[in-house]
């Protein structure tokens, strides 16, 4: 954050409908998380660990994020599973209140982004990182420059957004993304 951000009108207004959440850097659009129908998460919601398997061959942790999506979903769970020494899989299990709603898987990055349908190659300072959306079948990524959501915010320079918009059949399903330092994530 830049010092100027802290002086923005309502920056410290943390109520669910507060001005703070209209600023890009403070809401879920600038973080690696979900949005439903491109709406801001419920600010008074919480994510908490509801399951963990730290001693498993493929360790995992599951978060209950349901209260962050008040009035949008009846349940939202995110599981992080370490598949091997260089690959992690993120599974979002979502049960939408409206079957027509769209779940967007969003991430921001300073890396250069190359998208090929459901695969992404990130490069930054000579380092490489790979992502693949496994489910739902047919989901693809798109990329675009990050931009402010409210007039007066300090400019956002050098950040790219990565997004996959996913319709879930019957409003219930999974969004599964693998991330790895290796091109072959299997």
Residue ranges of predicted features:
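CBM-like, beta-strand-rich accessory domains located in the C-terminal region of large
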Residues: 5-186
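Conserved small/polar residues in nucleotide/adenosyl-binding loops
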Residues: 1
């Amino acid at each position: 954050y830049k010092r100027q951000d802290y002086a923005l009108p309502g920056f410290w207004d943390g109520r669910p409908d507060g001005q703070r959440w209209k600023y890009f850097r403070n809401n879920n659009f600038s973080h690696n998380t979900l949005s439903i129908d491109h709406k801001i998460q419920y600010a008074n919601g919480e994510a908490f660990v509801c399951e963990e398997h730290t001693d498993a061959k493929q360790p995992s942790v599951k978060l209950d994020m349901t209260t962050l999506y008040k009035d949008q979903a009846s349940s939202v769970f995110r599981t992080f599973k370490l598949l091997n020494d260089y690959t992690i899989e993120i599974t979002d299990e979502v049960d939408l209140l409206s079957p027509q709603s769209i779940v967007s898987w969003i991430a921001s990055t300073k890396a250069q982004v190359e998208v090929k349908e459901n695969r992404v190659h990130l490069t930054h300072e000579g380092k490489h990182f790979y992502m693949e959306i496994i489910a739902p079948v047919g989901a693809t990524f798109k990329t675009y420059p990050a931009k402010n959501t409210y007039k007066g915010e300090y400019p956002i320079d050098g950040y790219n957004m990565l997004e996959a918009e996913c319709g879930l059949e019957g409003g219930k399903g999974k969004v599964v993304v693998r991330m790895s330092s290796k091109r072959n994530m299997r």
